[in-house]
Amino acid sequence: MKSPRLVAYSPEVAAELGLSDQDCLSEDFCRVFAGNRLAAGMQPFAMCYGGHQFGHWAGQLGDGRAINLGEAVCPDGRRRTLQLKGAGRTPYSRSADGLAVLRSSIREFLCSEAMHHLGVPTTRALSVVLTGETVVRDMFYDGNPQLEPGAIVCRVAPSFTRFGNFQIFTARDDLDALKKIGGLHDSQRFSGIGRAGAADLSALVRGSLSLTAEMVVHWQRVGFVHGVMNTDNMSILGLTIDYGPYGWLENYDPDWTPNTTDAQGRRYRFGNQPKIAYWNLVQLANAIYPLVMRAESLQQALSVFSETFAAEWSATTAAKLGLSRFDPDKDEALVGDLLQLLQAAETDMTLFYRQLADLDPYAPAGSAADFVAMLERNSYAPLAAELRDRALAWFGQYCSRSRSEAGDPEARRQRMNAVNPKYVLRNYLAQLAIDQAEQGDFGLVAELLDVLRNPYSEQPGRERFARSVRIGPNSGRDVRCCLAVLDRAFTVFCSGYCTELPGWHTIVPFG
């Protein structure tokens, strides 16, 4: 690359890899993570994978612009793969240039680290480096391409193996390659998820099912919408991967997606993410079937998803409401009524749950007025009389349920604040940081990164980072902060690649 320049790095990821601040600020660091030179022991490679895009088999897809530098052994003995995204073409790039721009690289860098500190399983990001070169991109896909600053983000993960890495070899009937990739998932590296034998590959599916269910529960907990849950964007380890047109819910809307290419079908909308995750896992089971040849064992493995998701989501829902446990007989209706209320009032999900912790359900009835005021303060639609009545009724039920546990108010508040973040990476915040970075000022990127390291803490003096740009007397209801269309790092479904996969085994029917 022409003249690489460091934009930002993650001190936590660097420390995990055994790198000091001095290392990260060195010229060598910049050259290595711009792809200009290799450190000792690095052996770059790209991986071949296929996948289903928007429910259709799309053939071979990548790695189109991801280059693995190799595997690092951390000071604590753990292994981490380092991967450059945007460093140029690979043998699997097809017609693409393999490059990335600054805006998408900053979005991936900030979101990877934000998700980690939120407690969401994710790939990590070590650094963002400007390349000193420009890249042509049609930002709005309207036939008006422009030059943008190029950049490279360094991802870090135990493995970048995707569902699609298995799928492509099944599609090609290449059982030898399929066995090899299955054999890579040994107990030392992947904590016993699977080995190459048939029984162990069923265990691999079972382990991936459990990890994926836990990941999606966390997505739903914090209001994260991935946007492109194609099978090639699913990690075998249940890590959030490929941050393209992602977003966080502003107003609670289970039908919302930040991906403008999915605006009509809304396949990857917030409320559909658990179902899509399961659908993708069925495709993983299909891909592994030729090595197992026992549909029953895979069907048994697939049952893990619903069990794990239900258990994890029940516990998470209780914690979000400050309850010590989820009682289906009492709480299913309570939660259902709340979500309907939040949707009708267009309530900001993040702000609502965080501020609900500040209300005392054990106090006299006067706190009901405080609840309605809080709901109105954090809603994008005016509260009509009918919604106020519904809000009062719900809060009365919530207070009664909370009192039934005879809990301590402060313990309740702490329990809620441990799972309901104050700070998330709202799209407008990411865009403000990008705008400044494109002018050569990386200060807001650094400050945002620092704020997002402690999303559950109050952080006095930084309250502006918790605000929604849509709330306030001058915001207007038409202001939308979905800037996902600006991001080039997502795969658009191309009907030209849509073919049915021959010999596909249907393990579980799925509607």
Functional labels for PLM-detected ranges:
Residues N286-R294, D358-Y362, R377, S400, ...:
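Short, well-ordered loop/turn and helix-capping segments at boundaries between secondary-structure elements
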Residues A295-N420, N427:
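Helix-loop elements that line ligand-binding/catalytic pockets
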